[in-house]
């Protein structure tokens, strides 16, 4: 397995991966999300590759105060092999190198498998409510 920075020719493979991992929502345009990411810290957008096939991804961010992780997904046929852990670990190292003191992420409440994975990586549930507001409407995916 190789973990590397997303390349432009990964576009379709990553969107297909996200579809397989059920990461997409009708109100998020994945193409637009990728384009936006490529304009901000593109080196924090990582993919995992096995035999030339993209089998995992994570999209990281850092705003100078905290890091973030989005679109963490591993192809169902490759789960349980440490790929998600490797992606998060690489992202954490990149954030630490920037002086990032902490990372926050969001997981759907009913996603027990992913919550358990993060807990094994020493992530803790933080007692807060996440609020959001759409500032720009994306086209429906």
From Swiss-Prot:
Matches recorded under HAMAP family: Acetyltransf_YpeA
Family annotation (InterPro entries): Acetyltransferase_YpeA (IPR023072), Acyl_CoA_acyltransferase (IPR016181), GNAT_dom (IPR000182)
SUPFAM superfamilies: Acyl-CoA N-acyltransferases (Nat)
Enzyme class (EC, first level): transferase
Name of this chain's protein: Acetyltransferase ECA0875
UniProt keyword annotations, A-Z: Acyltransferase, Transferase
Pfam families referenced in this protein's UniProt entry, alphabetically: Acetyltransf_1
Acyltransferase keyword on record: yes
Domain N-acetyltransferase span(s) in chain numbering: 1-141
Top-rank taxon: Bacteria
Lineage: Bacteria, Pseudomonadati, Pseudomonadota, Gammaproteobacteria, Enterobacterales
NCBIfam families membership: PRK03624.1 (NF002959)
Organism whose genome encodes this protein: Pectobacterium atrosepticum (strain SCRI 1043 / ATCC BAA-672)
GO molecular function: acyltransferase activity, transferring groups other than amino-acyl groups
Family of the protein in this entry: Belongs to the acetyltransferase family. YpeA subfamily.
């Amino acid at each position: 397995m190789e973990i590397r920075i997303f390349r432009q020719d990964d576009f379709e493979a990553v969107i297909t991966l996200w579809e397989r991992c059920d990461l997409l929502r009708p109100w998020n345009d994945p193409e637009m999300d990728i384009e936006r990411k490529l304009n901000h810290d593109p080196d924090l957008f990582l993919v995992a590759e096995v035999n030339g096939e993209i089998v995992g991804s994570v999209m990281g961010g850092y705003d100078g105060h905290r890091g973030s992780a989005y679109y963490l997904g591993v192809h169902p046929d490759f789960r349980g092999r440490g790929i998600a852990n490797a992606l998060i670990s690489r992202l954490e190292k990149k954030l630490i190198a920037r002086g990032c003191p902490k990372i926050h992420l969001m997981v759907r409440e009913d996603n027990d498998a992913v919550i358990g994975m993060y807990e094994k990586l020493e992530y803790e549930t933080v007692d807060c409510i996440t609020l959001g507001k759409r500032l720009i409407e994306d086209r429906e995916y």
